[in-house]
């Protein structure tokens, strides 16, 4: 009996020791992941300090212009400043990586579009982030109507004249883009594929320096979001060739669409949205979505966006996540058929 009693005491001691070790381990796990959990009181107080909005694109571009207008109103609604932080490079992937690897505490937002979330993940090997795993989508903010424009000195004024010249002088025309995998790059390659033309790509570190070189007459063509060059178009410093929308735009009524210019199935509106690092607490993501959606419904904001050829969206986090997955599938097929490569 004494032996059995000792065995029982030993068994209880071992079991208690294992339980303590298990509970200690669970405590460490909870502490490690505590940044993913926001108590109700803390969630109600969010945000308690300024929020950084990582912008993978240069200042002055379409996404940057739209984001700064939204950031001001978002900050006013949240009661904290929203600071746009331009972190450019590698077609936007530098800023996207910074956003993906930031603490998931609700104080980092990252802008993302087709280039960083769809095209670069398809074209580039060893990308330092996964668009479907390393972000918590907040909302698709907008779709931006793009325009093909040229320096006023070019000898063509219409899409048909451009195609004729490109076919007569293959490889002698060139177009600028804000980097490999960017929306301007993909649209130009899609145009070449659909029209059977050979136009050389000149890649820049962002859309702003690319636009400047078209303004200077160093490069002949470029696709970009309309807000980036609307003032230069209206001043006659640049020439609009065609817009990618279904119908003509009120802000540039004399510029035809690609469809009416004879290029069928060429309707495209590059999009972009707001995301947070993966594992950002769900209540924070939902709060940011509600505030963004409210800002996008405000009449002055909608007027500012639509005047520049930007269509407000404001989709839910789930809808935006599904949209990213759909775009990955669609663009993977287009890139494969067109033979587009990272150059």
Question: For each predicted feature, which ranges?
Answer:
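Short, basic, low-complexity termini and linkers enriched in Ser/Thr/Gly/Pro
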Residues: 1-18, 29-39
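Sec-dependent N-terminal signal peptides
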Residues: 21-29, 342
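N-terminal (or domain-start) structured segment
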Residues: 43-133, 172-174, 180, 196-223, ...
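An extracytoplasmic/periplasmic, membrane-proximal ligand-sensing/linker region
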Residues: 48-50, 193, 260, 282-343
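Hinge/capping helix and adjacent helix->loop/strand transition within the periplasmic-binding protein
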Residues: 101-107, 122-209, 258, 271-304
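A ligand-binding cleft/hinge motif common to bilobed small-molecule-binding domains
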Residues: 116-126, 190-194, 221-255, 332
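C-terminal lobe and pocket-closing loops
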Residues: 157, 229-297, 329
């Amino acid at each position: 009996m004494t032996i059995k009693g000792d065995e029982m005491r030993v068994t209880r001691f071992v079991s208690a020791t294992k339980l303590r070790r298990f509970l200690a381990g669970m405590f460490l796990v909870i502490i490690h992941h505590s940044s993913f959990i926001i108590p109700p009181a803390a969630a109600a107080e969010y945000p308690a300090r300024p929020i950084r909005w990582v912008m993978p694109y240069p200042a002055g571009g379409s996404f940057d212009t739209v984001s700064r207008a939204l950031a001001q109103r978002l900050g006013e609604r949240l009661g904290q400043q929203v600071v746009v932080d331009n972190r450019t490079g590698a077609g936007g992937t530098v800023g996207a990586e910074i956003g993906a690897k930031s603490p998931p505490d609700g104080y980092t937002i990252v802008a993302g579009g087709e280039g960083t979330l769809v095209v670069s993940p398809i074209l580039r090997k060893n990308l330092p982030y996964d668009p479907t795993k390393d972000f918590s989508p907040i909302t698709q903010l907008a779709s931006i109507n793009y325009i093909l424009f040229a320096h006023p000195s070019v000898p063509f004024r219409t899409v048909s004249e451009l195609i004729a010249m490109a076919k007569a002088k293959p490889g002698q025309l060139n177009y600028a883009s804000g980097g490999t995998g960017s929306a301007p790059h993909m649209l130009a390659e899609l145009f070449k594929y659909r029209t059977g033309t050979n136009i050389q790509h000149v890649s820049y570190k962002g859309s702003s320096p690319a636009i400047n070189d078209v303004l200077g007459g160093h490069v002949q063509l470029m696709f970009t979001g309309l807000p980036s060059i609307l003032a230069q178009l209206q001043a006659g410093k640049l020439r609009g060739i065609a817009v990618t929308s279904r119908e003509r735009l009120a802000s540039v009524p004399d510029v035809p669409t690609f469809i009416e210019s004879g290029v069928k199935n060429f309707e495209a509106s590059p999009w972009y949205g707001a995301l947070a690092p993966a594992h950002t607490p769900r209540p924070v993501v939902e709060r940011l979505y509600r505030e963004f959606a409210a800002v996008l419904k405000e009449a002055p904001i909608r007027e500012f966006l639509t005047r520049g050829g930007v269509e407000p969206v404001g989709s839910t986090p789930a809808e935006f996540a599904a949209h990213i997955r759909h775009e990955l599938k669609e663009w993977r097929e287009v890139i494969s058929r067109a033979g587009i490569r990272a150059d």
